[in-house]
Amino acid sequence: MLDLKFVRTNPEVVKEALKKRNSNVSLDAFLEQEEERRKLLFEVESLKAKRNTVSEEVGRRKKHGEDAEQLILEMREVGQKVKNLEDKLGEIEQSMEAVLYEIPNIPHESVPVGADEEANVEVRTWGTPRSFDFEPLAHYEIGEKLDILDFARAGKVTGARFTFYKGLGAKLERALISFMLDRHSAKGYVEVLPPYMVHRNSMIGTGQLPKFEEDAFKVAGTDYFLIPTAEVPVTNMYREEILEAEQLPIHHCAYSACFRAEAGSAGRDTRGLIRQHQFNKVELVKFAFPENSYEELESLTRDAESILQELELPYRVMALSTGDLGFTSAKTYDLEVWLPSFNTYREISSCSNFEDFQARRANIRFRRAPKAKPEFLHTLNGSGLAIGRTVSAILENYQEADGRVRVPKALQPYLGVEYIG
């Protein structure tokens, strides 16, 4: 969330950021409450000063044997007024905090300004989409023909947007997880295997709640949520902590299953692995000094790109516009892999710098020196990569005319075969 003091002193900056994001959050009610809060605070402080003066007078009178009963009654009345005003002040501050939780992050100055994804800017491309001398199939058709993906039985067992991986399909998924974790660990990321359930405060800390609760799977009768991404537990590992400067930067990689309701995606990508309720992903999470966080974003993005390059999958990097930026992000690069069945690029990773937005919500701070005042650090994360979408890209880009799928060279040591099928 944003700094309350910043919002109070820079309302026009925040309003402009909300406008660029096409956000429907109104700051007017917040500012009206801020004005009322200031008035109440002044009144409370004035009454407290009066109470202190009366208290001193009561003490003086008692010391000299004078009657102080009327002053004592007056002091009690003042005390009750203070309590009532402080209760009202607490309600207003609670309401203001609720509004703060609804205000998205302020886009970095380098983010392209635009209404939606049409305003996203291509930063670079890598590789050349393959030309086929036959009609390429979609990944779900390939998976079903090779009997390595079973959508029908998963639908019978659970429902839509679930999949059984079978045989070499399951091994391909597992190989990709190991391959990605190995590559990221070799670059200094410390591997974490996180819990798949977190409580409400953790979801609030990374920004999924309260705004996106309809997209989350909640465990009935508990305060637990199934994680939508490893970002949530890994970021919250350091919630309510003050780190020392020598601990930074912290780089983690984490494999997890991810669970998403996809409430706003009815009718979109209903077939295949692109949009599932449950999917696997390797996540990259960073905790950085504020002054270095944009360098960290560039290196994180390159680390995610390196996986696609080793797998020899064509992709492009897109800088998201202000209108397409995620709620918590100050700047995001999307990596989009080429999928022949769509004849276009599709997102396979989002790499974001949240600056201190998540750190404020989760209260993650650091000290530059042993006795220095704690500061909020910057958090970053990115997919490195989404496994199901990587499987989709491999099946489609490496399919052969005879129905087999060639295994990328980088994965052959993990899978032990050159072809699937």
Swiss-Prot record:
Question: Which catalytic reaction applies to this protein?
Answer: tRNA(Ser) + L-serine + ATP = L-seryl-tRNA(Ser) + AMP + diphosphate + H(+); tRNA(Sec) + L-serine + ATP = L-seryl-tRNA(Sec) + AMP + diphosphate + H(+)
Matching entries from Gene3D superfamilies are given as: Bira Bifunctional Protein, Domain 2, Serine-tRNA synthetase, tRNA binding domain
**Which Pfam family, just one, is annotated for this protein?**
tRNA-synt_2b
Sites where the protein binds ATP: 260-262, 347-350
Q: Record's family?
A: Belongs to the class-II aminoacyl-tRNA synthetase family. Type-1 seryl-tRNA synthetase subfamily.
Pathway(s) it belongs to: Aminoacyl-tRNA biosynthesis; selenocysteinyl-tRNA(Sec) biosynthesis; L-seryl-tRNA(Sec) from L-serine and tRNA(Sec): step 1/1
MF term (GO), any:
ATP binding
Organism (species): Desulfitobacterium hafniense (strain Y51)
Q: What does this protein do?
A: Catalyzes the attachment of serine to tRNA(Ser). Is also able to aminoacylate tRNA(Sec) with serine, to form the misacylated tRNA L-seryl-tRNA(Sec), which will be further converted into selenocysteinyl-tRNA(Sec).
Report the HAMAP family cross-referenced here.
Ser_tRNA_synth_type1 (MF_00176)
Keywords, sorted A to Z? Aminoacyl-tRNA synthetase, ATP-binding, Cytoplasm, Ligase, Nucleotide-binding, Protein biosynthesis
| Alphabetical list of SUPFAM superfamilies matching this protein | Class II aaRS and biotin synthetases, tRNA-binding arm
Q: What is this protein called?
A: Serine--tRNA ligase
Q: Where does L-serine bind?
A: 229-231, 283, 383
- Could you say which EC number(s) this protein's record lists? 6.1.1.11
Fill in the subunit field for this protein.
Answer: Homodimer. The tRNA molecule binds across the dimer.
Q: Where in the cell is it found?
A: Cytoplasm
Report the InterPro entries cross-referenced here: aa-tRNA-synt_IIb, aa-tRNA-synth_II, aa-tRNA-synth_II/BPL/LPL, Ser-tRNA-ligase_type_1, Ser-tRNA-synth_1_N, SerRS_1_N_sf, SerRS_core, tRNA-bd_arm
Q: Which PROSITE patterns match?
A: AA_TRNA_LIGASE_II
Q: Name one GO cellular component term.
A: cytoplasm
